[in-house]
């Protein structure tokens, strides 16, 4: 290839598998970061977001054949893995000389398997991708070998699979350019009429819950962007795209209390009137902090409940107590913030009794909304190892790993029972008369969506009774 200074790069967000209840599209932040670093290095970047643009495999084939590409990189979670690989097969067929790459959480822990399963795949970029990606682009231009590129697993000249050591994490996240939103199909990313812009202000997590693959992807060290850098990005997207609401995608936004306070102060100083929400742990909020957040535009907090059973919380390695959860919800409500509960059902050790405790506990907390997720064994997590070791896995098709459908069963809980429990959990939560009234009074995006959901469950309940 010799010295080409500008490589043509196509980055792809794969479509959901056909069987999956498709979510409203989210901005693919990982690709937007890769696009930004590649553009900064002088390359041409195109992002194809199959979810936002509702592209089928056939439509993708047409699209990719119109884009000159030296490099085709596809991102994938476990749920999107097969879909991603189908796109890589297609891309390789149309551009046989292009280098194909897989990135994201699934490839990170399934790297050698992916290269073995799909000859059309050339390189897996593991863990954090920005530095690795730029280094690969440099190597491709100078025709050097990839032997010294940290953080990749690849097919070498002899066709053998080589796994290079991990790349150390990026310590100073402020060096990263802001995500390249201009490369995204923003018009197709609207939800209820507006684009919800996500920001990630930290990477890594000090806690290591057994069901979580994110921490294993981004490490134990909690790395933070500076308050100024965070608010610079908020101001930029506000000015450039007229955005008035953002959402923080950090695993736990309030790990460092002082930084959150500084972000809030910075927002006040710049008179940035933005609404925002964030997710965090129940043991990392207090009244003062929540008030400070509220006064700086925070409208909602996602607080990880996970379970209403101390036994299961212990098994998850979650390290919280139910009283901490109670206090966090009570305080958030008193301060006037909306709350959304994240709950995991069916973690190994779950029984009908512990699941019942959890459902009752969630009703007691009375959050404004809830997500009941089925414990799903993602490769790379201790939970996955445990499920495999005990021979509990029943579903090996990754297209079914959507956190709505159970994939394994334990002696204490069958797949059928777990599916039924999850449905009941939602039904009981949304059909409480007090809940519907509260949401009707609230109005706004959250209120309307909650009332619609309740109505859907009511209709299904009636239908079941009638049929």
Model regions and ranges:
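N-terminal [4Fe-4S]-dependent radical SAM core
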Residues: 7-10, 15-18, 146-149, 155-201
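Glycine-rich beta-alpha loop elements in corrinoid/cobalamin-binding modules
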Residues: 8, 24, 37-172, 376, ...
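Non-cysteine beta-strand/loop elements that form the S-adenosyl-L-methionine
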Residues: 129, 290-308, 368-377, 397
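Proline-aspartate-enriched helix->loop->beta-strand connector
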Residues: 68-69, 243, 367
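Flexible glycine/acidic-rich beta-alpha junction loops that bind and position SAM and/or redox cofactors
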Residues: 18-20, 111, 157, 207, ...
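Radical SAM enzyme core and accessory elements
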Residues: 2-6, 11, 44, 61, ...
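Catalytic cores of alpha/beta
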Residues: 111-117, 289, 349-363
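Radical SAM [4Fe-4S] cluster-binding motif and immediate context
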Residues: 26, 174, 178-347, 351, ...
């Amino acid at each position: 290839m010799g010295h080409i200074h500008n490589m043509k790069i196509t980055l792809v967000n794969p479509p959901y598998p056909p069987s999956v209840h498709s979510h409203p599209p989210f901005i693919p932040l990982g690709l937007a970061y890769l696009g930004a670093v590649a553009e900064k290095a002088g390359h041409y970047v195109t992002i194809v977001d199959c979810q936002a643009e509702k592209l089928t495999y056939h439509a993708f084939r047409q699209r990719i054949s119109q884009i000159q590409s030296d490099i085709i990189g596809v991102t994938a979670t476990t749920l999107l893995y097969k879909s991603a690989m189908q796109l890589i097969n297609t891309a390789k067929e149309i551009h046989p000389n292009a280098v194909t790459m897989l990135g994201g959480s699934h490839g990170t822990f399934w790297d050698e398997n992916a290269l073995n399963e799909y000859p059309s795949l050339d390189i897996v970029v593991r863990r954090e991708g920005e530095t690795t990606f730029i280094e690969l682009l440099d190597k491709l231009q100078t025709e050097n070998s990839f032997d010294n590129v940290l953080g990749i697993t690849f097919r070498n000249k002899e066709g053998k699979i080589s796994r290079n050591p991990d790349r150390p994490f990026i310590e100073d996240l402020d060096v990263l350019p802001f995500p390249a939103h201009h490369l995204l199909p923003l018009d197709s990313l609207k939800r209820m009429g507006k684009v919800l812009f996500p920001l990630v202000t930290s990477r890594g997590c000090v806690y290591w819950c057994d069901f979580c693959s994110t921490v294993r992807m981004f490490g134990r060290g909690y790395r933070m962007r500076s308050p100024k850098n965070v608010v610079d990005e908020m101001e930029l997207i506000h000015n450039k795209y007229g955005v008035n609401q953002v959402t923080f995608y950090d695993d736990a936004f309030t790990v460092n209390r002082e930084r959150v306070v500084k972000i809030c102060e910075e927002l006040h100083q710049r008179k940035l009137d933005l609404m925002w929400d964030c997710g965090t742990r129940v043991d990392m909020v207090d009244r003062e902090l929540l008030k400070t957040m509220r006064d700086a535009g925070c409208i909602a907090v996602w607080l990880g409940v996970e379970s209403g059973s101390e036994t299961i919380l212990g098994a998850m390695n979650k390290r919280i107590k139910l009283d901490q959860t109670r206090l966090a919800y009570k305080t958030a409500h008193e301060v006037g913030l909306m709350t959304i509960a994240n709950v995991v059902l069916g973690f190994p050790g779950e029984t009908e009794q512990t699941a019942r405790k959890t459902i009752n506990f969630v009703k007691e907390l009375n959050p404004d909304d809830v997500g009941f997720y089925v414990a799903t064994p993602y490769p790379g997590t201790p939970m996955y190892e445990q499920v495999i070791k005990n021979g509990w896995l029943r579903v090996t098709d990754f297209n079914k790993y959507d956190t709505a459908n159970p994939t394994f069963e334990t002696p204490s809980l069958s797949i059928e029972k777990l599916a039924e429990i999850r449905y009941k959990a939602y039904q009981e939560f949304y059909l409480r008369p007090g809940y519907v009234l509260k949401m009707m009074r609230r109005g706004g995006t959250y209120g309307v969506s909650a009332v619609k959901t309740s109505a859907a469950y009511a209709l299904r309940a009636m239908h079941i009774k009638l049929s």
